[in-house]
From Swiss-Prot:
Domain MTTase N-terminal: 17-133
Cofactor or coenzyme needed: [4Fe-4S] cluster
Purpose of the protein: Catalyzes the methylthiolation of N6-(dimethylallyl)adenosine (i(6)A), leading to the formation of 2-methylthio-N6-(dimethylallyl)adenosine (ms(2)i(6)A) at position 37 in tRNAs that read codons beginning with uridine.
Keywords: 4Fe-4S, Cytoplasm, Iron, Iron-sulfur, Metal-binding, S-adenosyl-L-methionine, Transferase, tRNA processing
Positions of [4Fe-4S] cluster 2 binding: 170, 174, 177
Every TRAM domain range: 395-461
Name of the molecule in the record: tRNA-2-methylthio-N(6)-dimethylallyladenosine synthase
Record-annotated Radical SAM core domain positions: 156-392
CDD domains linked: Radical_SAM
Enzyme Commission no: 2.8.4.3
Amino acid sequence: MTQTIQTQTGKNSGAGRTYEVRTFGCQMNVHDSERLSGLLEDSGYVPASEGVTPDVVVFNTCAVRENADKRLYGTLGQMKAIKDEHPGMQIAVGGCMAQKDKQTVVDKAPWVDVVFGTHNLGSLPTLLERSAHNHKAEVEIFDALEEFPSVLPAKRESAYAGWVSVSVGCNNTCTFCIVPSLRGKEQDRRPGEILAEVKALVEQGVSEVTLLGQNVNAYGVNFADETLERDRTAFSKLLRACGEIEGLERLRFTSPHPAEFTDDVIDAMAETPAVCPQLHMPLQSGSDKVLKDMKRSYRSKKFLAILDKVRERIPHAAITTDIIVGFPGETEEDFQATLDVVEKARFSSAFTFQYSPRPGTPAAEMENQVPKAVVQDRYERLLALQERISEEENRKLIGTTQELLVQADGRKNDRTQRRSGRSRDGRLVHFTPEGDVRAGDVVEVVITDAAPHFLIADGGVASHRRTRAGDMTELGETPTTAPVGVGLGMPSIKKPEPTTAGGCSTGGCGCE
């Protein structure tokens, strides 16, 4: 949309100015925000203290959720008064909504200083500097990826758990989804660079890593070297290779696509001790007709067959899902098919959404949009069914011993003084702590009660292992990962070479 930036931002262009990044949306946005924070601090900005108005506010936005535009512009409206009271304050808007709306952001909110998209995260410091110098808004949206996010520095949010992108973009054409048009076609990182980033995090105390992509099990479809043939076993190889990294205790991934989910991935999950017994597998609908209209290239029978295979190899796996209610043309019969699949699948939990038209998607133009009242009724019925199943599945764990990675989200309430942690299968557990239990430490507890969305362990702590991540949390420190260069092709997967203190591989370079 605009010319490529020619000037280079000075290393200390932030000159001690404070910043805050506010994130809306998915895990991909959360990870992108870590990159934005790393970029700003690399340019001299410092995080704003709690309760202090920052000099720069960056909104990393979502265009998928219902009313995402109203939420953004409503928030920007509130920011105008704050900016009027703080001369020199800058507001930047990035992410999927910025990629979609472009100049419209400034037209609707003229007090915004910078608009940047999903393909040019690295432009943010320069755009802030240029806007301040020129005293006008800078809007820069690229139609294709400028640089892989892995070449940007990152300031991690957590001392004990980290995101690592395996790819960006998506090659699917789901009729309800706007993500491919905003993030582009899938592009995959070299496995050697993924392993180097995982190893760098582990060396700084991180014990849990989640591999992240719009469709992680399609990994290997589009490396930078287009002459290389696709390797359909690339993701399972990556899981096994990550599992060989010493010190990595928990490995997760999100999200796979049922059409691409193969037996070699199930085998890698079952045979790699670090891989957690958890699978998030989006269903979207249990109706084959609706799945066809959604352009989801699988049917309910195949979906359930995958779950059977996973449970055969990993009997105690916790399986979660995404479901959309009220897709255009969905009949009561279609919805009943979804309820039937949910009953058979026995998900430990489900993220359920009421369909909302997203401008620019084929589904938004479809006939037979389902009335809002009907969608609400079906949503409540689905929710009630899944709540029952979730509680039934959780109650099966009463009396079992669970290993928890303690979380940093404080105590559950003042009366019980419970802390929270995640079991290896991803379930949330509220437990009664004993002694100096820190976020990032590992405890074992016995489950004493259950509810649909969490487990309770009020019998004390059976064991407590202090960790380096706990030490980092106590010091108020989080890992940082330095830029990883862009490389070509897909080398054979092996354990990563030793990394420098900054987290870069000593000899490799890769793509994200």
